[in-house]
């Protein structure tokens, strides 16, 4: 093709057409505007500076012009050929065929020409017929695509002997736009199979599939099955009951919970259990860059679902397309929300029409069919069969139009409020973080087809996995299986290498690597006897626990399975108080409910720094095997208005979704100082946070099975409303340890350290230099003694294992000083006495309490007067 030089005044469209013809499209199977646009932007960088939408329109215009030019050229060539044949000699001796056209130098021209012929051939005639044609159910399939092509043969190929006379007919004019309903662009498709590449969105919108899983593939969802049965199973299986009672059946269910808790799996299991089609799409499959197409996809989804009713529509991550309209950043988001609301409301309207109008029309048709059956066969059995079929048809027609919509999100607070009212998403089901019993059931379901050892303990694994959701447990099982395979190969390597005993350790390692390659590549399959002896053992799961980090831990949950009461020395009084307030209500909830105690307790621990307040909170959460959320006071504060309050709400919502749960607020004085500019120096931002905390702790909504532990070393600046009953009921003072308690703490800290026999921990704990030592100071003392023992070993060039001697402790005592001064210690003791006096304060003379009348006396201004 001759290269053209364009001047500044030449038509831009011709330049673009010339560049399209120069493109190398030999390796492409599908040509459309998007593909050609991307190729042009790759080859010619100046097109990247143009707006994408406007440039696509230019490409579309150029493609249409190319098709028009090709068709006109082909028509003129055919006319010239016919004229030459007529003017040729009438000699019958030899028939000379017209010369074949030279092969085209551009593949695009050939493909566009063949596609143009195919479209003209398949164009329906303009003459109308009296018999109405049955409308194709799937209008999205182009006319030139064979929808029944199930093999790899090209059934859509064009016959090379087809004449071009149809090109010149008036009814065969090329169309301006060859639209495909998937994206609204010109599509030129040349493929050898029926794979509709790029149209997976439309397939999900138009095809409902019945899943193969059911409730037997789930575990730990027994608490949700009752709501599912009431709001999904009953309306789909027996809608006639609701119509007979004159009530509208439920239409929508909103599943919310943390990521990986099983929302999508539950929706598929519901459809599989009921044997109804499921339209499962992601919210991003609905969105489109073309204005109005996103709303059209929502309408298409609901219309196709109504055509296949009864069925279920499942929209995953619905918060992506239905955010709050007042805070939406784009008009498209508002339009999608409005369209979704309209479609959900139309389900009730269609249901009422189907229950009144459609059965009557169907009844007339069924009566006519019944008469035809009686005319053909007058036997009574045929009449009875026809009437039974009519009753079944009426029942099926009655079910027509009932569609359940299930939405899934992990951010329900971001949904538009109009979606969460009656008639739309009637019921909200929370799938929180499973407890120990639910984790055990999930583990049994996931490992049902795995070969586990005979004495496998499900309860122990469930105990060691607090905060794990279904996806985390599934990942844990896969990691355990990987560890099992590695253990099997390692045992084979050790068995094989033990036979060869004439090599050094380094040589043995090299041989093991070579043997591993031999086992993986050239080794024959293991015998059935050996395979039967292979199992996944408990040790494989315990190794996997060290590698798998639950997703909830990244969202603020903290799983502390390693801290127990054994790691906490002394503090027996504080431990007893925490056991009565938190541990027992979590372990034995029924006993407390039978006594009428349903509100969980809150505990405020205060005292000097380093006395073990945070360690106690971790230990109590680990002992009761509850979910644990650790919140540092300042991390919830945000400079933007409303963000701090939202963070507080999110913490309590997350805890309620994963109950029983313990929320631990460290440095609580930074989060809840006194309001009104008191000693804490509160301001408007912190006052709003305090108000939000007060509401969440003891507001209109009960915090069921959500326990609160707060720790601070400045209880005097905390807002007084926080410490009233119903919020932080108990105030526990954690003092500096006594000499006896210091000895117990030292024993706890040194149980993993090699200590010489001459070390007397009681003497160290009662030493006067340890006076006013906190737990953190004692931990630093032990660490300093161990470091001195290591340094002494290096100085003496000793090869024996180092042990901590009494000299090391004496050296550490000479260097470590108490972190809490004597003045601070007295201040904390005085503060504790003041708090106890304020709570134990009673009237001096209880017998002289003035008694007032039952009816209050008011003055003329309606002010109460107390005598």
UniProtKB/Swiss-Prot annotation:
Main location class: nucleus
From the Swiss-Prot or TrEMBL record, state where the protein is found. Nucleus, Nucleolus; Nucleus, Nucleoplasm
Query: A GO CC term?
Result: nucleolus
Chain intervals with Low complexity compositional bias: 123-132, 141-172, 180-203, 844-855
Instruction: Spell out the residue ranges making up region: Disordered.
Output: 70-203, 351-370, 834-855
Which InterPro entries does the protein's record reference?
Answer: AAA+_ATPase, AAA_ATPase_domain, AAA_lid_3, ATPase_AAA_core, NLV2_N_sf, NVL2_nucleolin-bd, P-loop_NTPase
Which GO biological process entries does UniProt record here? positive regulation of protein binding; regulation of protein localization to nucleolus; ribosomal large subunit biogenesis; ribosomal large subunit export from nucleus; ribosome biogenesis; rRNA processing
Q: Where does ATP bind?
A: 257-264, 607-614
Q: Does the keyword ATP-binding apply?
A: yes
Give the protein's function. Involved in ribosome biogenesis.
Q: Tell me which family the UniProt entry assigns to this protein.
A: Belongs to the AAA ATPase family.
Q: What is this protein called?
A: Putative ribosome biogenesis ATPase nvl
Query: Which organism was this protein described from?
Result: Dictyostelium discoideum (Social amoeba)
Primary gene name:
nvl
């Amino acid at each position: 093709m001759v290269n053209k030089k364009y001047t500044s005044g030449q038509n831009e469209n011709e330049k673009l057409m010339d560049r399209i013809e120069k493109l190398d499209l030999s390796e492409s199977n599908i040509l459309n505007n998007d593909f050609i646009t991307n190729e042009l932007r790759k080859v010619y960088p100046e097109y990247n500076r143009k707006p994408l939408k406007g440039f696509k329109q230019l490409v579309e215009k150029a493609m249409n012009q190319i098709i028009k030019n090709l068709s006109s050229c082909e028509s003129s060539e055919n006319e010239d050929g016919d004229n030459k044949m007529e003017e040729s000699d009438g000699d019958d001796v030899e028939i000379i065929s017209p010369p074949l056209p030279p092969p085209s130098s551009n593949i695009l021209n050939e493909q566009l020409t063949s596609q143009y012929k195919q479209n003209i051939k398949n164009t329906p005639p303009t003459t109308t017929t009296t018999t109405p044609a049955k409308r194709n159910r799937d209008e999205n399939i182009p006319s030139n695509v064979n929808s029944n092509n199930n093999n790899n043969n090209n059934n859509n190929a064009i016959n090379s002997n087809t004449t071009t006379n149809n090109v010149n007919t008036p009814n065969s004019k090329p169309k301006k736009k060859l639209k495909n309903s998937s994206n609204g662009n010109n599509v030129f498709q040349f493929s050898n199979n029926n794979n509709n590449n790029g149209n997976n969105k439309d397939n999900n919108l138009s095809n409902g599939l019945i899943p193969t899983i059911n409730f037997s593939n789930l575990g730990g969802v027994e608490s949700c099955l009752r709501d599912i049965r009431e709001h999904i199973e009953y309306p789909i299986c027996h809608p006639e009951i609701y119509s007979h009672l004159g009530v509208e059946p439920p239409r929508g269910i909103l599943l919310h919970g943390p990521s990986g808790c099983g929302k999508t799996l539950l929706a598929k299991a519901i459809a599989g259990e009921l044997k109804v089609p499921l339209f499962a799409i992601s919210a991003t499959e609905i969105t489109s860059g073309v204005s109005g197409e996103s709303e059209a996809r929502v309408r298409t989804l609901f219309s196709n679902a109504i055509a296949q009713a009864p069925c279920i529509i499942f929209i995953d991550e619905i918060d992506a397309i239905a955010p709050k309209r007042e805070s939406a950043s784009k008009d498209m988001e508002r339009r999608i929300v409005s369209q979704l609301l309209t479609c959900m409301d139309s389900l009730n309207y269609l249901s009422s029409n189907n229950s009144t109008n459609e059965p009557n029309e169907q009844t007339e048709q069924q009566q006519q069919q019944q008469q035809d059956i009686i005319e053909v066969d007058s036997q009574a059995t045929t009449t009875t069969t026809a009437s039974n079929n009519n009753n079944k048809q009426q029942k099926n027609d009655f079910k027509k139009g009932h569609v359940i919509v299930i939405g899934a999100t992990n951010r329900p607070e971001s949904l538009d409020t109009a979606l969460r009212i009656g008639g739309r998403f009637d019921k909200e089901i929370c799938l929180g973080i499973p407890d120990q019993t639910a984790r055990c059931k999930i583990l049994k379901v996931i490992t049902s087809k795995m070969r586990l050892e005979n004495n496998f303990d499900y309860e122990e694994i469930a105990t060691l996995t607090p905060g794990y959701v279904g996806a985390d447990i599934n990942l844990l099982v896969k990691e355990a299986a990987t560890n099992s395979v590695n253990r099997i190969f390692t045992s084979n390597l050790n068995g094989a290498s033990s036979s060869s005993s004439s090599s050094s350790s380094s040589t043995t390692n090299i041989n093991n690597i070579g043997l591993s390659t031999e086992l993986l590549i050239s080794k024959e399959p293991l015998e059935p006897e050996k395979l039967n002896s292979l199992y996944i053992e408990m040790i494989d799961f315990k190794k996997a626990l060290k590698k798998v980090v639950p997703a909830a831990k990244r969202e603020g949950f903290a799983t502390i399975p390693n801290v127990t009461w054994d790691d906490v020395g002394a503090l027996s009084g504080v431990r007893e108080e925490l056991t009565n307030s938190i541990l027992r209500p979590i372990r034995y909830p029924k006993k407390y409910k039978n006594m009428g105690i349903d509100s969980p307790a809150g505990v405020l621990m205060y005292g000097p720094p380093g006395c073990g307040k945070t360690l106690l909170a971790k230990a109590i959460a680990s002992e009761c095997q509850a979910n644990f959320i650790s919140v540092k006071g300042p991390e919830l504060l945000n400079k933007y208005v409303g963000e701090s309050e939202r963070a507080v709400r999110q913490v309590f919502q997350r805890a309620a979704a994963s109950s029983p749960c313990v929320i631990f607020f460290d440095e609580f004085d930074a989060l809840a100082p006194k309001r009104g500019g008191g000693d804490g120096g509160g301001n408007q931002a912190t006052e709003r946070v305090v108000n939000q905390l007060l509401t969440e702790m003891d507001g209109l909504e009960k915090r069921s099975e959500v326990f609160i532990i707060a720790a601070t070393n400045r209880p005097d600046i905390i807002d007084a409303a926080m410490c009233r009953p119903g919020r932080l009921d108990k105030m526990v003072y954690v003092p500096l340890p006594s000499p006896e308690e210091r000895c117990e703490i030292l024993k706890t800290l040194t149980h993993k350290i090699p200590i010489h026999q001459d070390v007397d921990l009681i003497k160290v704990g009662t030493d006067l230099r340890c006076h006013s030592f906190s737990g953190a100071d004692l931990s630093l003392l032990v660490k300093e003694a161990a470091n001195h023992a290591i340094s002494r070993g290096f100085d003496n060039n000793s090869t024996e294992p180092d042990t901590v001697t009494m000299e090391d402790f004496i050296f550490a005592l000479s260097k470590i000083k108490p972190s809490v001064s004597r003045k601070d210690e007295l201040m904390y003791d005085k503060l504790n006495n003041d708090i106890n006096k304020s709570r134990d304060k009673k009237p001096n003379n209880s017998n002289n309490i003035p008694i007032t009348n039952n009816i209050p006396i008011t003055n003329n201004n309606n002010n109460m007067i107390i005598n």
